[in-house]
A protein has these predicted regions:
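Short, low-complexity, charge-dense intrinsically disordered segments
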Residues: 307-312
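Catalytic core segments in nucleotide and nucleic-acid processing enzymes
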Residues: 1-273, 279-291, 295, 304
Length: 312
């Protein structure tokens, strides 16, 4: 099955002009009858299918680069240094008609083009907790569009208006999914300290860092650290994450940040925005692999020039 909406766009972490640093957006339209609480009820099959689409895209992308067919013409989802994956925006779209109860002055409006998130429309599928950049961590969101606006837009057959709407809604998908991630995770940048072997530190601590680190650009000298956020625990509860899990993971995250301080300049927490900014730091180190010092089997001995206790 072909999904209804799939396109290549800006990654959720950082903007880029290079195709290899973009990501895939995967969307499917669900124009079902709405419930009394004005929500579209999705079946389990629809949800699992949407996760399967994302997994298939990830594996297809992996095969391109494993087979040597990437050639910079496709997004490269996996970062080879950290083995983290660029998060894939995955979403449903449903149609709504502005009503008197929830739309106020926009009742039956043909001009309301706002993309709205459905209440309780966020779902999270994962194999491990607190690993945003793991390939099996898949976020799924659900949005509404004004059915009357869409009918009006395509009924007029105005190509420029349709192109403007497409550009607007694609940016909105990115902004809104970024907003959801900001509720779930705390983001920090890591820049290597001068004189420290940061590459080896990542290798030695791979188990602790797996799924938490990502290098958004292949030649960048910084990493992104994403850790589960404790403050907005209500959204975690809506995702059926136990409070004991939140406490355990956030406690381990604090220990991890302390450990990273020995080799990296760790920034203050920041939120994902349209543009990405990084602090300017003097005398930063490098993330490249350092040559190992050669160890030779040398035996060193001492011979006294004189020995006061020795007599002929």
């Amino acid at each position: 099955k072909l999904v209804d909406h799939m396109f290549v766009g800006q990654g959720l972490i950082e903007q880029s002009d290079l195709t290899s640093e973009l990501t895939y957006y995967i969307g499917d339209s669900k124009y079902y009858k709405r419930s009394r609480n004005d929500r579209t009820q999705l079946g389990d099959k629809s949800i699992y299918k949407q996760y399967t689409y994302a997994r298939n895209v990830i594996q297809w992308n992996m095969n391109l680069f494993l087979d040597g067919d990437g050639n910079g013409e496709h997004p490269q989802l996996r970062d080879t240094l950290t083995e983290g994956y660029n998060p894939i925006p995955n979403f449903f779209i449903s149609a709504r008609i502005p009503d008197k109860k929830t739309s106020g002055g926009k009742f039956l409006s043909f001009d309301d083009k706002e993309l709205k998130a459905q209440d309780g429309g966020v779902q999270l599928n994962r194999q491990f907790e607190n690993r945003l950049f793991d390939r099996d961590t898949l976020l799924l969101c659900h949005y509404d569009v004004n059915f009357l606006y869409i009918v009006s837009l395509y009924g007029r057959n105005n190509k420029s208006a349709q192109a403007a709407w497409r550009d607007y809604v694609r940016k909105e998908f990115r902004n809104k999914i970024q907003g959801t991630l900001n509720r779930l995770y705390t983001f920090r940048t890591l820049q290597p300290r001068d004189g420290m072997d940061c590459y080896q530190f990542i290798q030695d601590n791979f188990q602790r860092l797996n799924g938490k680190l990502y290098r958004p650009k292949s030649d960048s000298n910084y990493l992104i650290l994403a850790l589960m956020k404790e403050e907005d625990s209500n959204i975690w509860k809506s995702l059926k994450i136990k409070s004991s899990t939140i406490k355990r993971e956030t406690a381990q995250s604090k220990e991890l940040v302390d450990a990273l301080q020995t080799h990296f300049y760790v920034s203050d927490p920041f939120e994902l925005e349209t543009e990405f900014h990084i602090d300017s730091i003097d005398n930063v180190g490098t993330l490249t692999q350092q040559p190992k010092q050669e160890i030779k089997n040398i035996l060193t001995g001492l011979v006294r020039k004189t020995d006061a206790d020795y007599s002929d």
